[in-house]
């Protein structure tokens, strides 16, 4: 009897020890992460046409008939450089495998997309006795985007508090815009005398077509406590978008709203304020380049769609809480 009780006691102790060991070795199921990232662009491409202006950095010199292009360089880059903040929910199926879903907000650095210095704006009417207007402008773009990023995570094992992991996933944009802000300076001369100066400002908002991107990351977490860890990730993402529509939401001259007003420098029409991006222009398109009837100012302008890149390599630092 005593022998049976002793065996029973040993069995209970063994089962308790095994249960405690399994509990200790069992990975957390749900976890959450808060992180902040900084990305650098990994590839540069030529920027799209901005308001009819080629993606060049042009410099003109001379006056009237002697106003000539003396320097031109292509403006290249991408919107892959910038800051991102995000929150992530994850679930571990096993010691090695898990899934995550991240919600991220990204703001790129501003990038110069087109620039011109001292170009004669009215070459057909300017003369030594009639007004000659010269324009200088800079157009800068910035992307702001909210996306969801589901991913599969492979944990590589824990040692000395560190647990490295890798993950791959997709990037699904939920909302985002490319904001293009252009500052123009129009300087008007009659002969050698300056008779007028107009500072014009416009803001164009480009909305993209639906698309999808891809990401891969290598990271590690480090335990700070029972449920709290710090983590760091090196992430690469490959992502391009192309425009669907563009709207001029602001246009001022010397600080006065002229969005829907005809001026010496711009027609305040639907065609000026709205653009529909297409893959092909033909004689039926609302574009003066291909339509023999010119532009219908009461309808949105048709322009060729082009791509901009948001690919980048970034470092994310943050805190992880495990349930």
Please give the residue ranges for each predicted region.
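Bacterial Sec-dependent N-terminal signal peptides
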Residues: 1-25, 319, 323
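Outer-membrane beta-barrel biogenesis signature
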Residues: 5, 19-53, 161-163, 280-284, ...
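Outer-membrane beta-barrel "beta-signal"
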Residues: 31, 307-323
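Residues on the lipid-exposed face of transmembrane beta-strands in outer-membrane beta-barrel proteins
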Residues: 36, 87-91, 101-103, 148-154, ...
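Extracellular/periplasm-exposed beta-strand and loop segments of Gram-negative cell-envelope proteins
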Residues: 42-80, 107-147, 173-211, 242-310
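Short, solvent-exposed loop/edge-beta patches enriched in aromatic
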Residues: 81, 89-98
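Repeated loop/turn-to-beta-strand initiation elements of outer-membrane beta-barrel proteins
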Residues: 96-99, 160-162, 227-230
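Substrate-binding/catalytic groove segments of enzymes
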Residues: 222-231, 240-245
